[in-house]
C-alpha cells in the first residue's frame, strides 16, 4: 500500500541572479501531523527552502506538492501555510486580541446545515409572534384602539395556522437552492477539468519540443572540450581568471620572461568565453520558455480545484460571525498561554510573550501546515526552553504539520519527529533525532550535531574494527561493512566510561579540562596523539592517565 504524504518536494532548486545556488535539487516527503525540523548552519539553504514553501521566493525549478498538487506557482494567500517569523511581525497599534483576530476577518466557513437554518427561521417566527403578543397585552391594558386590537388578534390566529407551512416552505426552498448550486458545481467542475486536461496536453507537447531544443543546445557545449568542462562558468569567475592572467603576464614581463603563451591563453579564454556566452544566451532563453510552460502547467493542474474553491466560497460559504471569531481567538489565547494579556499592546510584552502572540495569530486561521522561521532564536535560554515545551504541547493538541527552521541542534533534537540536515543547499540526511545523533551518515553531520570523537580504523569482520592506534574494538551494528575497508568511527563523549589504567579498551592521558556545571569536559590523547573528548562528573587532574570503556552499541561506522 502506497504511503500518503501531505507535502512532496521534488527536485527543488533555487539559483539567484548572481549564480549562487541556495537550494540544490532537493527531495523531501512529509506526512500529515509530523514535526519536521530543517537543521543546518547559516547559509545552508534552510530558510530559502522555507521561503519557497511559503511562496516568498519563486523556485528556479522543481515541484512543491501538497496533497498531490503542485502549488509552487500559487500566490501566498492561497497556500495552506501560515508562517511564524523570528521578528514577530506584530501590528504595534493593535492589542494582543486584535493582532490574533486580524486574520479571521477574511476567513470563511461552510454554510450552516439546513436544519440549523430552519431552526433559526423557526425562532424568528416565534420572536415575531412574541412581539405581537406583547403589543396585544399593551393595547388590552390601555383599552385604546379596540379595532386595532381585534386585527392583531386575528393576525396571530392566521400566523399560527401558517406557521408550520411557512417553516416547511422555507426548508424546501433552501434545499432546492442548495441542490441547484451543487448541480451547477458538478457541471462546472466537468467543464473545468476538461479545459485543464486540454491545456495540459498542449503544454506537454510544447515541453517535448523544448526538450529537443535543450538537447541540441547541450550538444553545442560538448563539441568543444573547454566548453564541456567550463559550462558552469559565470561572468564573475571569467573576470577573475582574466585578471589573474593579466597580473601573471605583468609579473612575467617585469621579470623579462616570455609571455607569448600566456597572452595566447588569455586571447583563447576570451574567444572561448564569448562563444560560450552565445550558447548561454540560447540556453537561458530556453530555460525562460520552459519555466513559463512549467508555470502554466502548475496553473492548469490546480485550475479545477481553485475554481471549485472560489465557487464554494461564493455560494456555499459565509464569513465568520463576531461571536465565532471571538470563540476562536479565546480558544487559541488559552492554548498558547496568553490569558489575561488580551488588552496589552506589543510594546508592553516580553520577547517570549510576543512570540506567543505571533504563534497564536498563525494558529487561529487553522492552516494545514505551520512554518516556523527560527522563532525562538532571539529569546534567552530559559524562555526558549519553556516555549519549546509549549510548541510540543501545541503540536500534539492541534495535530497540525509543523516545519521548523533552526541552527540550534538541541532544539531540533528536542522538538522533532524527523530532522532534515542541510548544508550548502543539499539535504545530507533525513531521520529521527536518534538516527541523526547516533548514526550520522558523514563526519560533518557527526561534528555538527553535538560533540564527536572520530577515529580511523579498518573493519576486520565479525563486527570488529582495528583502530589506527592499534586497539581492536567492537560494534553491534551490522550494516554489511566490507572486510579490509577503512572507515571512520564515531563515539560520543558521553558514551565513555572511565576505569583504572590498563583496565579499559585503551588508555588516554588528560591534556585539558573545562567545568560545565553538571559535568567536566575532559580532553585527552591516545598514544598516537588522537584527541578524545569525554565527560566526567568528577574533576580529573591534567596529565593523569586512565582507561576507558564503552558499549558496542555506541560505536558507529561511517564511510571515509
UniProtKB/Swiss-Prot annotation:
Any one GO CC term of the record: plasma membrane
Entry's localization field: Cell membrane
GO molecular function, one term: ATP hydrolysis activity
Protein residues bound to ATP: 40-47
Reaction(s) the record says it catalyses: ATP + H2O + polyamine-[polyamine-binding protein]Side 1 = ADP + phosphate + polyamineSide 2 + [polyamine-binding protein]Side 1
Keyword entries, A-Z: ATP-binding, Cell membrane, Membrane, Nucleotide-binding, Translocase, Transport
Domain of life: Bacteria
Top-level class of the enzyme under EC nomenclature: translocase
Domain ABC transporter: 7-449
Record region (Insert): 108-318
Protein's membrane topology: Peripheral membrane protein
Enzyme Commission number, as recorded: 7.6.2.11
Pfam families: ABC_tran
Similarity comment: family membership: Belongs to the ABC transporter superfamily. Spermidine/putrescine importer (TC 3.A.1.11.1) family.
Quaternary state and interactors: The complex is composed of two ATP-binding proteins (PotA), two transmembrane proteins (PotB and PotC) and a solute-binding protein (PotD).
Function: Part of the ABC transporter complex PotABCD involved in spermidine/putrescine import. Responsible for energy coupling to the transport system.
Protein name, UniProt field: Spermidine/putrescine import ATP-binding protein PotA
Phylogenetic classification of the source organism: Bacteria, Bacillati, Mycoplasmatota, Mycoplasmoidales, Mycoplasmoidaceae
Gene designation: potA
